[in-house]
Amino acid sequence: MNLIKSTGTFSIFVIISRVLGYLRDVLIAIYLGSGPIADAFFVAFRLPNTFRRLFAEGSFNAAFVPSYSSELTRGKIKAKNFANDIFNFLILGLLILVIVVEILMPGFIFLIAPGFYEDQSKLELTTLLTRITFPFLLFISLASFFSAILNSHNKFGVAAAASIILNIILILIILLEKNSDDNLVIYLSYGVSIAGLIQLIFVYFFAKKYFSPDLKLRLKITKKIKLFFNKFLP
């Protein structure tokens, strides 16, 4: 019964998230228009989301949940140790990735929007906005980790509810700052990263009942860690 209830709650939040996502896109189109500012924001929004699809969505859950659930059958301590090892590898890898991309941002923009190099002001704006939004990847990937913990315990509603946060924050920013002219796109970019942080805090609040990480500087690659990354990485 609890599983059915959780699945129903998940479905409701997914529908709400999609409706809010549509409203968000409509408002962005209205207030940012279709000029260079809108183009810059869409690239800034797309780059961290492109990496998120690689690191923080289905492939991570598909690799982590079965392995973690298997460890749970062997005891809570073994499951915690496994999850903690994965968390430490994940946060280290994400920090390195975010720092490298922040430093080399113009190059990454060239990869996904090479035409921007023909307009220096557009390139500079896109670089600025993407450097603001890119930490979203760190926050949302860690949120996905804790969502996977919850999914392993048949708690699906929290992750689905968390997906609404980004849309709500961006909608509120547009409605409150719609008369801010060129500053609106800056506020929206900060809103993306702030929403990711809030989403991480929200999911962790519920996941800490089952797992709370212990940060370690020394990382050990075990057979189980290798097996996880073989499943996770393409």
Where are the language model's segments positioned?
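Membrane-embedded alpha-helical bundles of multi-pass transporters/translocases
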Residues: 1-234
